[in-house]
Amino acid sequence: MKKNFFVSTPIYYVNGDPHVGSAYTTIAADVINRYNKAMGMDTHFVTGLDEHGQKVEQAAKQNGFTPQAWTDKMTPNFKNMWAALDIKYDDFIRTTEDRHKKAVKRILDIVNAKGDIYKGEYEGKYCVSCETFFPENQLNGSNKCPDCGKDLTVLKEESYFFKMSKYADALLKHIDEHPDFILPHSRRNEVISFIKQGLQDLSISRNTFSWGIPIDFAPGHITYVWFDALTNYITSAGFENDENKFDKFWNNSRVVHLIGKDIIRFHAIIWPCMLLSAGIKLPDSIVAHGWWTSEGEKMSKSRGNVVNPYDEIKKYGVDAFRYYLLREANFGTDGDYSTKGIIGRLNSDLANDLGNLLNRTLGMYKKYFNGTIVSSSTVEPIDDEIKSMFNDVVKDVEKYMYLFEFSRALETIWKFISRLNKYIDETMPWTLAKNEAKKARLAAVMNILCEGLYKIAFLIAPYMPESAQKISNQLGIDKDITNLKFDDIKEWSIFKEGHKLGEASPIFPRIEIEKEEIVETKKELKIENPVDIKEFNKIEIKVVEILDVDKVEGADKLLKFKVFDGEFERQIISGLAKFYPDFKKLISEKVLAVVNLKFTKLKGEISQGMLLTTEDKNGVSLIKIDKTVEAGAIVS
């Protein structure tokens, strides 16, 4: 494993304000960066702003500023938001900086010297907002931008072109040989399909406006914004400015770009082709996340449903907001932001599960030992089970974090929290406290809980640094928990004899949801085909999370579901293809399944259960469960 780690967000358009989508990407980058630091790696985390282009020039003019003054004015909007979200980046890059201009000029010179740039003329439909030309084969006769929906402009101008088509085969080969180059793998297939349609050469210059980086070998031309913007990653790593830094954080790092799925084409096609031409190492992984809706609807200013991160952290706290975004949706799929969802997570996961574990532990230690650690050498099998489970949790978290499965990593940590809560019920400290001969055993139990809580605080620190530190402080340890490494917490002897624990104080206060009036209509009850309760109890129904969905080969009606039932991944075949043509949208949904049916084979595929559905005049629908309910929850 490489010892260095480089992670980036996209650089955001300076014209806009940060929103829940950009906050999501940047929080994710912050979390993965903090995690890799805890793994003992040297890390570099860069975010920043894309400050060139026609629309920046136009916005500056409309507001009475020069382009540079306009970008200077807009920059604090992003820096202040990231500070409010407790994001600790190593570099905030602006494309107007001299170091970046130097890097862009250098990569252009390298690519040009290789013979991969030529002069031509471009005529096509252009989106000013997205600063992108679109060939007719992407428009299907429309004059609307396929990305933002705005009207396209027919533009004809002299331009310099990059021979991107030359690198199509080399890029396909690289993607094939590096399975994790594009994540999730569904995006990988999308990119491969696009490349196989035939790559066109890329227009990389403009001469109809002036706000950009001049091209030395093309007087009167400035660099096309994407060729400019994408280079920011190597600029930050030290390209053409700090050779040692570049060697460390690009050539000898695991290099990861976190992006939204709308810009996957630029990052997974244009950027790698540029690097192939320049002879520079390609990134190790390009990870594209989904979009967020709000209360089930697309966010838009006209609807008034855009989620403002400032409002959310004011209501729920910064850590609850960070936790919810990364727990609620798998990183590669779309997510829905809802008031009910975040309150449910805060009350259930944070206040009930974690908060109660901390309060119970500290309360009992104060009651039984006056809040002072008493050492004990008594060990029972259940203690070893807890320690063994923690080791497994660390391994699973490492596996999920490597693949950017933030939600699965958090779910794994919460299983350990649940296990410690159950450990209290199993060991019954209140009963041990009544017997003086059991005081040593009581101390051993309480110490397991304190040690476990400190380890939990360490594991959640990348996600919730402020709350993790509060837990540490309440356990009587004031050192900065975000600076610890995994080696610092692997032993179960952190708390020494005489150590004084702190005072318990609620970290996650519960939020009450206003109860809606429930109107019941009484009808005469008739039961047809009654089932004996003993027979019904034989059926085991669980909440399962849909991990992936595909069509069954050779069967138009069948879908193959990969689900997680809280313990195991299983495959279930269901005849739902007709009712879910966009079946990939089902990924990350929680549904109900019968999990103790005899396995059966359908069209050569093993089905290990049955998904429960409803049927009415509108068709057949899966029974979807609130995402706050854990996979594996039993329906009874």
UniProtKB/Swiss-Prot annotation:
Binding positions for Zn(2+) per the UniProt entry: C127, C130, C145, C148
Keywords assigned: Aminoacyl-tRNA synthetase, ATP-binding, Cytoplasm, Ligase, Metal-binding, Nucleotide-binding, Protein biosynthesis, RNA-binding, tRNA-binding, Zinc
Cofactor-binding details, from the entry: Binds 1 zinc ion per subunit.
InterPro entries per UniProt: Anticodon_Met (IPR041872), Met-tRNA-synth_bsu_C (IPR004495), Met-tRNA_synth (IPR014758), Met-tRNA_synth_2 (IPR023457), Methionyl/Leucyl_tRNA_Synth (IPR015413), MetRS_core (IPR033911), NA-bd_OB-fold (IPR012340), Rossmann-like_a/b/a_fold (IPR014729)
EC number: 6.1.1.10
GO cellular component: cytoplasm
The tRNA-binding domain, residue ranges: 535-636
Cofactors: Zn(2+)
Residues at which ATP binds: K301
Similarity remark: Belongs to the class-I aminoacyl-tRNA synthetase family. MetG type 2A subfamily.
Protein name: Methionine--tRNA ligase
Species of origin: Fusobacterium nucleatum subsp. nucleatum (strain ATCC 25586 / DSM 15643 / BCRC 10681 / CIP 101130 / JCM 8532 / KCTC 2640 / LMG 13131 / VPI 4355)
Gene that this sequence comes from: metG
